[in-house]
């Protein structure tokens, strides 16, 4: 290479230029490699800040677009539902979007009615049309069925005993005994209570026990409104709900009913529950709760109803005894308390002027101030004389005193002008009678009389818990009553003794008179 350079001197500038170019080329990466550290860090921060700002803006934009998109989607769905629900005639969208819907209740009922009438015989068709005409002419709750004031007071006084079943006398196919024991016979009918189910509490509940049920008898237990065709079963017409013995549920129609629960037979207990706030009806069977059967029955007054199409016996418990359903027993879901809260009427007493009790009082006094004994039990000491008028003229009264006492005439033997307080004159005859005693003739004796036994009912000795009750009682026998002959003989002896005393008094008076006349001559 040296030889080449030396041999060609004209190529020296060209080689020098190439060397300078090569030197610049080799020095260029060195200048990039030694960039200062401060410049490098500032450049990286700018790049990172720019990338973070871009990501924040992108997140905000995405969030706004998603929210607006969700709102637009919800509004679009709402418009579609509103359009199909309120603009399609004859169809109602019931559940999912895209389902074609079902006919409303009236159209479905008309369709079921037309199909059922074709399958009915003449008697069933006649009974159904008769009940339909009754419901159309007597809509539910067309009569006032709210609890009146008198019924409310009866509930307060009697408690749950105020409810009772009222059978239709014109049908005469069921008999009610002891208010809640129902016996059905050979044709179809039902019976409702006289009072509706209250609405004050949270839940009301009642049970029915099947005492007697043949296999071919259909029983329907539930609630219904008044007026209701009593020649039909509950659940067959508006508004009524029932649980039948075949295990089906009946709600306002007799054509077809879905299977609701197990069948019930003789010995089973069927309960009916009502929630007034939500209008929900549910049933129980032998203490086990079944699912709800109806909702929204809040405005109607519902009456417990029991019906059957054949012979059977059903006993209803409104709360007068314990329930089989334990929850109803604990929470006291009966229609009313077992006993009433009002006190019974006040008892009649002697202080209230009770005529019934005054008639039996032994110490009754008459208005004239003396005792008037009952003529059926009146007797004297001898037992052979009847009571006469009083022997005493009574207390002295002034001439201006007005009294309603009986006036008794007393014969007087005093001479005119003598004082009323003079001594009683001596008897003038031998036939002196005692005042107040009427003597019978010996030839016509009165009938034998037996006095009643003495009673201590009105005395303190007759009571058993009084303070004056004697600790030891002695039975005293009444004295014997003499016969009529003994009484006549005793009266004759008393009359003869009185005559002897009178004759002695007369002799003594005459003797004193003779001695009194001769005394002046001796003086």
Swiss-Prot record:
Signal peptide: none annotated. Glycans are attached at residues 421, 430, 492. It holds the Pfam family SPRY. Residues 1-59 are cytoplasmic. It is a single-pass type II membrane protein. Keywords: Endosome, Glycoprotein, Membrane, Protein transport, Signal-anchor, Transmembrane, Transmembrane helix, Transport, Vacuole. It comes from the Eukaryota. Belongs to the SSH4 family. Components of the endosome-vacuole trafficking pathway that regulates nutrient transport. May be involved in processes which determine whether plasma membrane proteins are degraded or routed to the plasma membrane. This is Protein ssh4. The gene is ssh4.
């Amino acid at each position: 290479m040296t030889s080449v350079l030396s041999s060609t001197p004209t190529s020296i500038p060209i080689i020098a230029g190439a060397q300078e170019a090569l030197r610049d080329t080799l020095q260029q990466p060195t200048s990039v490699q030694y960039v200062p550290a401060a410049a490098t860090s500032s450049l990286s921060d700018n790049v990172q800040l720019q990338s973070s700002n871009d990501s924040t803006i992108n997140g905000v934009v995405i969030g706004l677009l998603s929210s607006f998109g969700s709102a637009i989607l919800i509004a679009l769905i709402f418009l579609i539902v509103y359009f199909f629900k309120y603009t399609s005639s004859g169809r109602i969208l019931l559940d999912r979007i895209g389902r074609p819907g079902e006919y409303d209740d009236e159209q479905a009922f008309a369709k079921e009615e037309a199909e059922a009438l074709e399958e009915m015989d003449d008697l069933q068709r006649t009974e159904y049309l008769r009940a339909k005409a009754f419901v159309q002419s007597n809509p539910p709750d067309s009569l006032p069925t709210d609890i009146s004031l008198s019924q409310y007071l009866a509930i307060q006084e009697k408690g749950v005993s105020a409810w009772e079943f009222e059978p239709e006398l014109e049908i005469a196919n069921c008999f009610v005994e002891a208010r809640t024991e129902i016996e059905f016979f050979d044709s179809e009918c039902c019976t409702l209570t006289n009072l509706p189910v209250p609405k004050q509490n949270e839940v009301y509940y009642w049970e029915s026990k099947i005492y007697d049920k043949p296999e071919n008898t259909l029983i329907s237990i539930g609630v219904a409104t008044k007026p209701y065709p009593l020649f039909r079963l509950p659940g067959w017409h508006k508004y009524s709900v029932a649980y039948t013995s075949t295990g089906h549920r009946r709600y306002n129609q007799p054509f077809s009913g879905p299977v609701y629960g197990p069948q019930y037979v003789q010995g089973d207990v069927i309960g009916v529950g009502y929630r007034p706030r939500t209008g929900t009806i549910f049933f129980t069977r032998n203490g086990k709760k079944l699912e709800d059967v109806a909702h929204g029955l809040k405005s109607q007054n519902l009456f417990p109803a029991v019906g059957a199409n054949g012979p059977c016996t059903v006993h209803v418990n409104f709360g007068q005894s314990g329930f089989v359903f334990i929850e109803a027993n604990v929470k006291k879901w009966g229609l009313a308390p077992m006993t009433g809260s009002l006190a019974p009427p006040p008892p009649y007493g002697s202080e209230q002027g009770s005529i019934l009790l005054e008639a039996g009082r032994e110490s009754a006094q008459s208005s004239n101030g003396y005792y008037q004994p009952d003529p059926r039990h009146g007797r004297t000491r001898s037992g052979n004389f009847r009571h006469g008028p009083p022997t005493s003229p009574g207390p002295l009264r002034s001439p201006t005193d007005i009294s309603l006492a009986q006036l008794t005439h007393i014969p007087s033997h005093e001479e005119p002008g003598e004082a009323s307080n003079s001594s009683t004159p001596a008897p003038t005859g031998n036939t002196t009678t005692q005042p107040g005693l009427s003597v019978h003739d010996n030839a016509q004796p009165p009938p034998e009389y037996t006095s009643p036994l003495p009673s201590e009912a009105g005395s303190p000795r007759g009571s058993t818990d009084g303070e004056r009750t004697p600790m030891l009682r002695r039975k005293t026998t009444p004295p014997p009553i003499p016969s009529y002959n003994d009484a006549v003989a005793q009266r004759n002896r008393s009359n003869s003794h009185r005559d002897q005393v009178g004759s002695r008094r007369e002799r003594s008076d005459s003797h004193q008179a003779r001695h009194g006349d001769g005394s002046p001559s001796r003086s």
